Amino acid sequence: MSKNKQDAGLSTSAGLVRYMDEDASKIKIAPEKVLGITISIMVLLFILNYGLLA
């Protein structure tokens, strides 16, 4: 009886692994670009909040 329970767990795990392998996002952005955009927005907000341009 424990053999049947163990088989069910393995097939469930295998299905989850297959789902994660097939799940691909259509938007692909390099991590460097995400960091660059984030830092740019932070600098822009800092400049706008503290008025360093004038």
Curated annotation (Swiss-Prot):
One Gene Ontology cellular component: plasma membrane
One Pfam family cited in the UniProt record for this chain: Sec61_beta
Compartments where found: Cell membrane
Transmembrane segments: 31-52
Record topological domains on the Cytoplasmic side: 1-30
Membrane topology: Single-pass membrane protein
Topological domain spans for side Extracellular: 53-54
Domain of life: Archaea
Record has Transport as a keyword: yes
Example GO BP: protein transport
Keyword tags: Cell membrane, Membrane, Protein transport, Translocation, Transmembrane, Transmembrane helix, Transport
Its biological purpose: Involved in protein export. The function of the beta subunit is unknown, but it may be involved in stabilization of the trimeric complex.
Family statement: Belongs to the SEC61-beta family.
Oligomer status and interactors: Component of the protein translocase complex. Heterotrimer consisting of alpha (SecY), beta (SecG) and gamma (SecE) subunits. Can form oligomers of the heterotrimer.
HAMAP family: SecG
Full protein name: Preprotein translocase subunit SecG
Originating organism: Methanococcus aeolicus (strain ATCC BAA-1280 / DSM 17508 / OCM 812 / Nankai-3)
